[in-house]
């Protein structure tokens, strides 16, 4: 018997609808999402959830830095610093998932 996952299912549905109805290229879409995550002080899990699609769309570390620089005057330095920390925690999560025994 499968455990119901209504919250996860809803999140997947709204993300799919966003992608389906957007006219942006995958790269532009992921840059916009990154800017929004910085603006709302998204938690590390949000960055982690978007890491795969971001990498697949060609987003680079320089792109991430450029977006953070671009939004800093609008969202404030505290949110940009928080985003940097949350990105680092997301990276740590990804490493832990990829190598749970820490053998890499």
Where are these regions (language model features)?
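Acidic, glycine/proline-rich low-complexity segments that act as flexible tails and inter-domain linkers
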Residues: 1-31, 39-41, 45-56, 80-104
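An amphipathic alpha-helical micro-motif enriched in hydrophobic residues
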Residues: 30-41, 65-74
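C-terminal structural segments of small proteins and small subunits
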Residues: 65-89
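Short basic/hydrophobic patches in alpha-helices and adjacent helix-turn junctions
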Residues: 53-57, 70-73
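Winged helix-turn-helix DNA-binding recognition segment
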Residues: 59-64
């Amino acid at each position: 018997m499968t455990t119901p996952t209504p919250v996860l299912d809803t999140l997947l549905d709204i993300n799919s609808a966003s992608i389906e109805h957007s006219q942006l290229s995958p790269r532009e879409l992921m840059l916009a999402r990154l800017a929004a995550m910085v603006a709302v002080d998204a938690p590390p899990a949000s960055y982690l959830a978007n890491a795969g699609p971001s990498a697949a769309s060609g987003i680079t570390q320089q792109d991430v830095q450029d977006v953070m620089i671009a939004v800093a005057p609008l969202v404030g330095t505290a949110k940009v610093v928080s985003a940097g920390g949350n990105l680092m925690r997301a990276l740590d999560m990804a490493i832990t998932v990829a190598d749970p025994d820490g053998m890499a």
